[in-house]
Design a protein with these regions (language model features):
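Aromatic- and acidic-residue-enriched segments that line the glycan-binding/catalytic groove
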Residues: 32-44, 78-106, 143-160
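Aromatic-lined carbohydrate-binding/catalytic grooves of carbohydrate-active enzymes
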Residues: 15-51
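Aromatic-lined carbohydrate-recognition surfaces of secreted/lumenal glycan-active proteins
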Residues: 60, 64, 69-81, 139-142, ...
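The substrate-binding groove and active-site-proximal loops of carbohydrate-active enzymes
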Residues: 1, 37-52, 105-120, 158-168
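Active-site-adjacent "subsite" loops/lids of carbohydrate-active enzymes
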Residues: 1, 61, 71-72, 77-132
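Aromatic- and glycine-enriched glycan-recognition loops and surfaces
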Residues: 2-15, 42-66, 167-175
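Active-site and adjacent substrate-binding regions of carbohydrate-active enzymes
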Residues: 121-138, 146-147, 154-163, 173, ...
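Catalytic domains of carbohydrate-active enzymes, especially glycoside hydrolases
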Residues: 3-30, 132-137
Length: 196
């Protein structure tokens, strides 16, 4: 993995790229050493298994050596994109420990954006990254309710539910922004919006 990352960074540097977006939270897990989230299954094939090195620390060191910035890229809500059995998750995964924090949609599991405990978990995750790593930025992707997540009564004539959902997302984004700025005010924070 390290050799592959170095090759990618060298190619990016040679093409004039100055900032790398590195996915650090694909499924409520971590591509970095975390006391909050388990190791990502993307590293070893088994969620919770230590890969023997810290990919985020490695990429930051290698990118900074090349004069490149690194933004940690997170999917805040996605837990499982295919399947709904929390028992397949690592025993220290918050979703397995507390399935009441989840919503099911399209055969996958997501943290429920309505819940303050979810907002706190996401904010704590970002705070851990910003505190422990010389990161240049944090970027969110898929920071919304699943597109076709059903409305409580099937429709929302007055937009009350849609407005409440937007407000929950706004609250989470503001909480994360405040967390970042309270730790390292210079770290950038961005969101990759999805066109609807």
């Amino acid at each position: 993995q390290k050799k592959e990352l170095i090759k990618i960074l060298d190619t990016l540097k040679d093409t004039g790229i100055n900032t790398v977006m590195f996915q650090v939270r694909p499924y409520g897990d971590a591509m970095y050493k975390s006391s909050i989230n388990p190791w990502s299954k993307e590293l070893t094939g088994t969620q919770g298994k230590d890969p023997g090195y810290d990919p985020l620390a490695f990429i930051i060191q290698e990118a900074h050596t090349r004069g490149m910035k690194v933004h940690a890229w997170l999917n805040p809500y996605r837990v499982v994109s295919s399947g709904t059995d929390v028992n397949v998750l690592s025993s220290n995964h918050l979703a397995r420990q507390n399935p009441s924090l989840l919503i099911e949609n399209r055969g996958g599991l997501y943290y429920n954006p309505d819940l303050q405990e979810v907002k706190d978990h996401i904010s704590n995750t970002v705070g851990e990254i910003v505190s422990n790593y010389d990161i240049d930025g944090i970027t969110f992707d898929d920071y919304f309710y699943p597109t076709d997540y059903p409305l409580p009564q099937g429709e929302d004539k007055d937009g009350v539910v849609a407005n409440a959902r937007r407000e929950h997302i706004n609250q989470m984004i503001l909480q994360v922004k405040n967390t970042i700025k309270s730790i390292k005010p210079w770290v950038r924070f961005g969101v990759s919006p999805r066109g609807v």
